[in-house]
Amino acid sequence: MKHKSLFALVLAATLLLTACAASEPELVRYDHPTGLSLTMWEGFEGQDAEGFVGGYINQDQGIAILMAEELFASLANVGIDPEMTLEEYGRFLMDCYGLEGTVESDALGNTRFIYDRDVQGGQARYFAYLYRNDVAFWTVTFMSARDKADGLEGTFSQWAATIELPTEAVGQVRGNS
């Protein structure tokens, strides 16, 4: 599916431009044009990505973030129950993309699943956090080089805990770009 190759492409470009930082940058609030907002390190730039409603990239830190919206109405139109839990939705995504692992709650109560992929220039680890509002499921995926991932896991959980979703549909649905 398009997400796999897009994740690989975005992360490969990021990994090639990664530089080590001596200390963590300041936290700032990002308000995306979709209405989604989150707090994370300064230095991220908005990034358009086909098949996603948006994203961010920080080349200095080697981190990319992609945001996807899947409307409940679109799920219902293809016979999938939009009333499923976040855990069920996570398993649905993992099945769709052939990913192995488990859907879990992190130490801060965020629902997520984690997976690794080989990309040009190395291995990447993906932390996919799951949300829902009144009209859609949302997936916000934080990506980094696998060898940096353990050191970023807590940071990603903290950032994920700050996410606020838009109240209306954005309009871009996974697989319908």
PLM-predicted stretches and their roles:
Residues 23-50:
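N-terminal "mature-domain start" segment
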Residues 43, 47, 92, 96, ...:
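Structured segments of extracytoplasmic/periplasmic soluble domains
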Residues 40, 85, 89, 152-159:
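Stable alpha-helical elements in mature extracytoplasmic
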Residues 1-7:
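Bacterial N-terminal signal peptides that target proteins for export
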